[in-house]
Amino acid sequence: MLIFNDLRHFLPVVPRFVYKSLKKHPRKFGLTEIVLDNGRRAEGRWREKTENLTHKKITKKHLLRCIKKIGIFNEDNRAGIYQTLHRISCIKNRYGNIVGLTYRIGREFIGIGPIIRDLIESNQSTLLIGRPGIGKTSFIREISRILSNEIMKRVIIVDSANEISGEGCCPHISTGKARRMEVQSINSQHEVMIEAIENHTPEIIIIDEIGTEYESQAAISISQRGIRLIGSAHSSDLFNLAKNPTLCKLVGGIESVTLSDTQAILRKTKKTILERKGCSCFNATIEINKKRTVKVYTSVEQSIDAILEGRVNNSQIRSMKLNGEITISLNYQDE
């Protein structure tokens, strides 16, 4: 597995003393974020720790210089660096002035595909879940590359903040031959998802960060039209996703059902229980918890039913070693 994150592009958009410190750092290639806050020292973030990069504090003047070079932030306070996968987000005070910047390091993972190759080659809609910053978007880029370059599928990426395909007129090479539809407003992402189907005849739609009621409904509509969907959502695990009132619709939704006395006795449960309301628009789910380890649920509906009924929920733990060897073990988990 090869990991690429070109830090050279940060030179124009961070203070020079921060870049010099970063360039000398022994673990610079494992960096996930750089944080610049007014009146504080520059901070570097890794998966397992955070540390100060400089002794010198960031001033308002430093931030203004960075902002001038970065350019315009969109309505969700994000910007990108041209022809890269990096993302910059800003923090504003109550007067609308920028007082902090977060630089997210965009990565290209080449070779992570084999760990989920069977799911990629199948015709299954797949949902990737995990906490923010765990690597869902990097997985999605590699899935897009394999589907469009190797399997030769017609793939369209609906890119809300150019986070999947990077900033610029042309999608980043890491996404393969997939076409990209940019979203002008974060409130119109669901409309672009439907537009992609109606106008461009894709076989597969890819979308990052499904998070609103409208986007969930659009995902359901896409699945009902027979289009394969690859998406991601923020959640620590499938159990918490099923409890989320907005995102639970992606896996069929949950409703309260009252049983008769006889049914309750036969099921050995309470009279009022929770059941899956409908069909899931995703067939499989991939939980990303570690860098090279994923938990795979090959049947979302069976897994959700098991969670709601308190039964043992079977999943697969898949890991990739540094030498490329893949191990798969069954995980018997009682939710």
Swiss-Prot record:
Annotated coiled-coil segments of the chain: none
InterPro entries: AAA+_ATPase, P-loop_NTPase, Spore_III_AA_AAA+_ATPase
Keywords: ATP-binding, Chloroplast, Nucleotide-binding, Plastid
Residues that hold ATP according to the record: 130-137
One Pfam family in the UniProt entry: Spore_III_AA
Subcellular location: Plastid, Chloroplast
GO cellular component: chloroplast
Keyword Nucleotide-binding part of the UniProt annotation: yes
Main location (coarse class): plastid
GO terms for MF: ATP binding; ATP hydrolysis activity
Family: Belongs to the ycf45 family.
Protein name in UniProt: Uncharacterized protein ycf45
Taxonomic classification: Eukaryota, Rhodophyta, Bangiophyceae, Cyanidiales, Cyanidiaceae
